[in-house]
């Protein structure tokens, strides 16, 4: 197993380039199941979760050719509609093949998901919506067994609560359904906008893209001709490097981003007294004379993303005063707190609210353990300003979602090395 060794207190400067968004790429790869042609995807991030999902496409009978950050996928040869536990257990996003497989073939079996260690994410909302579209669904021996022998039927779907994965699954299912599907209380994330735009550019009639009401006219099980596209930039990776600049209080330019997608993060950095310069496809963080405390509530897009709260918690340890973070979306999403405490942070938990008493220079390097993807990035940020050396173990979590993290950090001046455990 590998770990990261980070020596804190180094000056960072220059610029960093952001990769394609993992959370956009995963549903887009699932979407290729709806295609009749070879599909070219560019700006694909080279991270473990993407490679796992491509393996799943292979297991289903599809094929792909990958070169650096581009992949050509052909799913016309799919002859297996079972997504088995061995792959699904490592990544919850595997559930995204459920909608497209069922819509295309009229039957599929998908193992109940594993992956993230950040609380329950029940797939009930996905299943209820598919049942409203005419599917018969049973859960047997850990598998979702879904059938719709005559194809899925368009329906009015009202999600009880906003669900990103549920919206993605139903958008894809609706693309091949018979008739019109209306999704009410749809998620509005940029990743969902791109999924809808790719389908629309491929001939599927979709209205309401980027709103909470999406209307999709299905093709009646006719496969679609999916045009080539590039994955949008990763707003969470961008936000993480913005926090790297802020926590070290140095100037850093972050290239290949869509600033509109970063509005909530930019707003909170400005509240913390940082100036953020914006260009068409870059943002620059400027240092401040005082890092001010901040109060954050996580919520659905366009609000503050839950995937950024761990990084802002690390940043808040360096603020002059008391910050709060109210996690409204997931339970068990404060597992990084115990590790930040090992570094010397002053953090108190009360249910889903964390109170952080900040003080610049308060952290000291030691051994810590990553517990999930975003928690591990918080530990990296904390290590950048901790006195001495920090060893971050179980960094396979980082590799799930950050492309070449130590390489990018080294290029901007951080002292980061990857080593093997003895």
Swiss-Prot record:
CDD domains named in the record: UdpNAET
Pathway recorded for this protein: Cell wall biogenesis; peptidoglycan biosynthesis
Sites of 2-(S-cysteinyl)pyruvic acid O-phosphothioketal modification: 116
Binding, phosphoenolpyruvate: 22-23
Keyword Cytoplasm: yes
Residues that coordinate or bind UDP-N-acetyl-alpha-D-glucosamine: 92, 121-125, 307, 329
GO BP annotations, alphabetical order: cell division; cell wall organization; peptidoglycan biosynthetic process; regulation of cell shape; UDP-N-acetylgalactosamine biosynthetic process
Family annotation (InterPro entries): Enolpyruvate_Tfrase_dom (IPR001986), Enolpyruvate_Tfrase_sf (IPR036968), MurA_subfamily (IPR050068), RNA3'P_cycl/enolpyr_Trfase_a/b (IPR013792), UDP_GlcNAc_COvinyl_MurA (IPR005750)
Gene Ontology terms, MF aspect: UDP-N-acetylglucosamine 1-carboxyvinyltransferase activity
Active site: 116 (proton donor)
Record protein name field: UDP-N-acetylglucosamine 1-carboxyvinyltransferase
Natural source organism: Aliarcobacter butzleri (strain RM4018)
Organism classification: Bacteria, Pseudomonadati, Campylobacterota, Epsilonproteobacteria, Campylobacterales
Gene: murA
